[in-house]
């Protein structure tokens, strides 16, 4: 656990990784750390489950409420990010990541658990398996320039 100063507006963990504090006395155990990767679509089902509300359906989100309770739950294997913090001055990036690895659309792979600032791309033949797995996940997601939504 390192302190990272600066980096907002960058695709490294310094700009995209945000800590989440969950507080529900008597329900969510104190001093618990959950390493699950979640994305924004997971918040609505999580809040619904935590409050006993009916979840929206259909949804891409997964509740991470069980993990907050210290249970296994149904954690995501990875998350997909389409990142363009400054559309007027930066080119969009696509990447997929899990708790340890991150693969960009340009095929750069990083071991983010050990290289938080992404200084050393992983190129070793030993990374072939994880690269293939993450590439398969990335291939399922919209590519740059695709229309993501239609309003008919």
Identify the role of each PLM range.
Residues 1-11, 28-32, 36-114, 129, ...:
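C-terminal cap/loop subdomain of S1 sulfatases and analogous C-terminal strand-loop tails that border
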Residues 14:
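Ligand-binding/active-site lining segments
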Residues 17-18:
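Catalytic cores of eukaryotic secretory-pathway lumenal/extracellular enzymes that build
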Residues 21-23:
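Short beta-strand-to-turn element immediately C-terminal to the catalytic PLP-Schiff-base lysine
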Residues 123-134, 138:
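C-terminal structured subdomain/cap of oxidoreductase catalytic cores
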Residues 138-144:
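A short, conserved beta-to-alpha structural element at the edge of catalytic cores
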């Amino acid at each position: 656990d390192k302190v990272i100063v600066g980096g907002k507006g960058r695709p490294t963990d310094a700009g995209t990784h945000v800590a989440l504090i969950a507080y529900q006395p008597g329900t969510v155990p104190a001093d618990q750390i959950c390493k699950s990767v979640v994305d924004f679509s997971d918040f609505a089902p999580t809040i619904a489950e935590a409050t006993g509300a009916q979840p929206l359906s259909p949804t891409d989100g997964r509740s991470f409420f069980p993990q907050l309770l210290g249970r296994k739950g149904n954690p995501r294997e990875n998350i997909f990010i389409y990142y363009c913090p400054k559309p007027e001055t930066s080119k969009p990036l696509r990447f997929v990541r899990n708790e340890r690895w991150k693969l960009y659309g340009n095929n750069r792979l990083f071991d983010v658990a050990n290289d938080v600032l992404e200084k050393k791309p992983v190129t070793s033949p030993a990374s072939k398996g994880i690269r293939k797995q993450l590439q398969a996940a990335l291939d399922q997601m919209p590519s740059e320039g695709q229309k993501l939504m239609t309003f008919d």
